[in-house]
From Swiss-Prot:
Catalytic activity field: an N-acetyl-alpha-D-galactosaminyl derivative + UDP-alpha-D-galactose = a beta-D-galactosyl-(1->3)-N-acetyl-alpha-D-galactosaminyl derivative + UDP + H(+); a 3-O-[N-acetyl-alpha-D-galactosaminyl]-L-threonyl-[protein] + UDP-alpha-D-galactose = a 3-O-[beta-D-galactosyl-(1->3)-N-acetyl-alpha-D-galactosaminyl]-L-threonyl-[protein] + UDP + H(+); a 3-O-[N-acetyl-alpha-D-galactosaminyl]-L-seryl-[protein] + UDP-alpha-D-galactose = a 3-O-[beta-D-galactosyl-(1->3)-N-acetyl-alpha-D-galactosaminyl]-L-seryl-[protein] + UDP + H(+)
Residues passing through the membrane, by range: 7-29
Gene3D superfamilies: 3.90.550.50
Name assigned to this protein: Glycoprotein-N-acetylgalactosamine 3-beta-galactosyltransferase 1
Encoding gene, per UniProt annotation: C1galt1
Organism: Rattus norvegicus
Region (Disordered): 41-72
One GO-annotated biological process of the protein: kidney development
Amino acid sequence: MASKSWLNFLTFLCGSAIGFFLCSQLLNILLQEQADVQPNMLHNDPHARHSDDSGHNHLKGQMDFNADSSQHKDENTDVAENLYQKVKVLCWVMTSPQNLEKKAKHVKATWAQRCNKVLFMSSEENKDFPTVGLETKEGREQLYWKTIKAFQYVHDHYLEDADWFMKADDDTYVILDNLRWLLSKYNPEQPIYFGRRFKPYVKQGYMSGGAGYVLSKEALRRFVDAFKTEKCTHSSSIEDLALGRCMEIIKVEAGDSRDPTGKETFHPFVPEHHLIKGYLPKTFWYWNYNYYPPVEGPGCCSDIAVSFHYVDSTTMYELEYLVYHLRPYGYLYRYQPALPENILKEINQVNKKEDTKIKLGNP
């Protein structure tokens, strides 16, 4: 009798175990399907800036939107080209060995081409891509170490090659021409940095890591020197907050990156999360973190936006097309914010010389 009861008990345990296993497998399949249909972009942690993989299907090959340049042959890029020469921006992109094919190569094929200099920073060197090996481990807890070492590397090797130094993730899309306009009003010898300004924990605020941030040459000097003199230390693994605290200690100003109408230019999410009302629930951390009152809907974003975050490989090319190729026929651009007088004067002088050449019949 006892052996029969024991056998029944074992049968029950085995059945329960098998049932639990099958249920867990089914649940995993359902959750994976849900992730593929609606990727999890709403991170509950405001400092979860850099993810290795969001579950998306990544494009395998690069795309070249400049292959057919015939439609752009009459395009006047004088102002952008002048700013390219006058406001030199070095971009360094935080990536990892496993993200080179998934993400970094699409950054390389799109917006990174407009940097005056671009570097891809990883834990390991890759001479083919290429990447700079920072000799760190991978993982979220290493982000600030990678940031410190990346800025130190840039300072030691490229300080005189640029005026401004931008950090971006490999899932950030940056419109460099708009960034140069923003920076053109400032002196790179001024200790200042720009990005999407958040307010908690730092009196002057700090810049969102995911939306990217840009340091002036003097800010970079002070940041690197602060670790040599131990004014700043690796106080936290939370990259953007720790960097913001250091900037306040070394008296680097947290600049206002809004446009003349008060709209934000750096964005910590993809466009639809800012543009569509109700996409971000009011209980979401984002609403309490902004230094300036956030706007939901069409008023959220400047016409001269600088960056968006959590951009997958497909969206990277969509933004490239929408920003640099799509135009409504018959319209002159409606919003052209003013340039600094010195740059505007130089552009006008160049245009006068070109007009003179044309009148004289010179090529």
